[in-house]
Design a protein with these regions (language model features):
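Residues at or immediately flanking beta-strands
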Residues: 85-87
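Glycine-centered small-residue motifs that form tight turns
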Residues: 28, 287-288, 321
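Short, small-residue alpha-helix embedded
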Residues: 104-118, 287-293
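Helix-loop-helix module between adjacent transmembrane segments
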Residues: 96-98
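C-terminal nucleotide
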Residues: 1-11, 18-21, 36-82, 91, ...
C-alpha cells in the first residue's frame, strides 16, 4: 500500500497572474503558503482484476480508458500505469471548491503515488510540471499553475512565471519572529459557500486572451501588489502585509462580477471592525474561505462566530507533496 499527501494552500499576494493567458505575455508573480490541511491518496494492489476508483463516487472499470474521473484517467496514462489490479482512494481534510487549491493538491498527490508505485523518484518541480500538463494542457482547464507548484514544494514560497513557461521559485526569507507572528495572526473562516474556480477563472482567461485593457490593468496591479507583499514579509512588516492584503481584495473584487457578493462584503467589513487589519477571499473568489490578518484575534473570532462562520485553524506545511507510507 502507498499513501501520499499534498498540502492545501493560501495565496498571500499576486494570485491570478499564474494563468498562461497572462504570464505568456507579461510574466506572472505570486506568493503562496502551503498549510497543514491535506489531500490524501491511497494506492493498493488488489487481488481482483479491475481498477477501483473511490472519491465522491465509486468507479469499477476494466481499463484506464473507461475511467470517468478525468484527472485520474490522465495521470494513469501520463505515468504509464495500466495495471488493472489497483484500488485508488482519495480523501481530504477540507472539501473541494472552497478556494484552497484542492485540485492541484489532488493531482500532485496522485502523481506522487503513481510514481512511487512504479518506483520512480520525481523532483517537486517535475511533479508540479506534470500536474500542470494534466490539468492545463490535457484537460484544458482555465486555471493557473500556483496550486500545483505550492502543493509540490510546500513552504511559504515566491513564484515567478516566465513567458516561455519556465517557473522559478524560492522560499520567502522570514525571520523566526515574523514566521511565528504570521502563522499566529492569520485566521481562516469558512463562508459556507462552495464554487468551481473554473467559472470565475474562465472569465479572466477569456478577457486576458482578448487583451481586455481593464482585465490586464487589474492583473498588472495584482502582480505589483504581489511583489510589495513579498517585500513586506521579508522586511518583517506584517501590518503592511495586512494592508496590502486589503488593497488586493478591494482591487480583486472588482475584477469579476462573481468575485464577491453582499454577504461576503458584510462579513469582511465586520472583520475589519473587529480586530482584522486586512484580509481577502482565498482562491478565485465567490466563496470558500475568508482569511484575515488579526491584531485582536479573540475579538475577531468572537465576531465571526456570531456571524455563523466556522474557523479552521492551521499551521504552515514545509514538506510539500510526500509519501506517508509505502510497503
Amino acid at each position: 500500500m502507498i499513501i501520499t499527501r499534498s498540502p492545501l494552500r493560501v495565496s498571500l499576494g499576486g494570485g491570478g497572474t499564474d494563468l498562461p493567458s497572462y504570464y505568456r505575455e507579461f510574466g506572472g508573480f505570486l506568493v503562496a503558503a502551503a498549510i497543514d490541511k491535506y489531500v490524501y491518496i491511497t494506492l493498493h494492489r488488489t487481488f481482483v482484476q479491475e481498477l477501483i476508483i473511490k472519491y465522491s463516487k465509486l468507479e469499477r472499470v476494466a481499463t484506464v480508458d473507461e475511467i470517468e474521473h478525468p484527472i485520474v484517467r490522465e495521470a494513469l496514462r501520463l505515468v504509464g500505469v495500466a495495471n488493472p489490479h489497483l484500488e485508488l482512494t482519495s480523501m481530504a481534510d477540507i472539501p473541494a471548491g472552497t478556494g484552497l487549491g484542492s485540485s492541484g493538491s489532488f493531482t500532485t498527490a496522485l502523481l506522487k503515488a503513481l510514481h512511487a508505485y512504479k518506483r520512480n523518484i520525481i523532483h517537486p518541480a517535475e511533479l508540479a510540471a506534470e500536474a500542470c500538463v494534466i490539468e492545463l494542457d490535457r484537460l484544458g482547464e482555465p486555471i493557473g499553475k500556483q496550486d500545483q507548484y505550492i502543493a509540490a514544494v510546500g513552504g511559504i514560497t515566491a513564484f515567478t512565471f516566465h513567458p516561455d513557461g519556465r517557473v522559478e521559485y524560492c522560499p520567502v526569507r522570514l525571520s523566526e519572529e515574523s514566521l511565528f507572528n504570521l502563522e499566529d495572526n492569520l485566521l481562516l473562516f469558512f463562508t459556507g459557500y462552495s464554487r468551481a474556480a473554473s467559472t470565475i477563472l474562465k472569465d479572466q482567461n477569456d478577457r486576458s486572451k482578448q487583451n481586455d485593457p481593464t482585465m490586464l490593468e487589474h492583473l498588472h496591479r495584482t502582480k505589483e501588489l504581489g511583489h510589495r507583499s513579498l517585500d513586506a514579509l521579508e522586511a518583517g512588516n506584517l501590518e503592511e502585509f495586512a494592508h496590502l492584503m486589503d488593497m488586493h481584495w478591494q482591487h480583486k473584487k472588482t475584477r469579476s462580477d462573481g468575485m464577491s457578493n453582499p454577504q461576503i462584503n458584510e462579513w469582511y467589513d465586520a472583520a475589519l471592525a473587529n480586530g482584522a487589519l486586512g484580509g481577502k477571499v482565498i482562491g478565485a473568489g465567490g466563496g470558500g474561505f475568508l482569511m484575515f490578518y488579526a491584531i485582536d484575534k479573540a475579538r475577531l473570532r468572537r465576531a465571526m462566530r456570531e456571524k455563523g462562520l466556522q474557523e479552521v485553524r492551521f499551521r504552515f506545511d514545509f514538506e510539500g507533496t510526500k509519501i506517508v507510507t509505502q510497503n
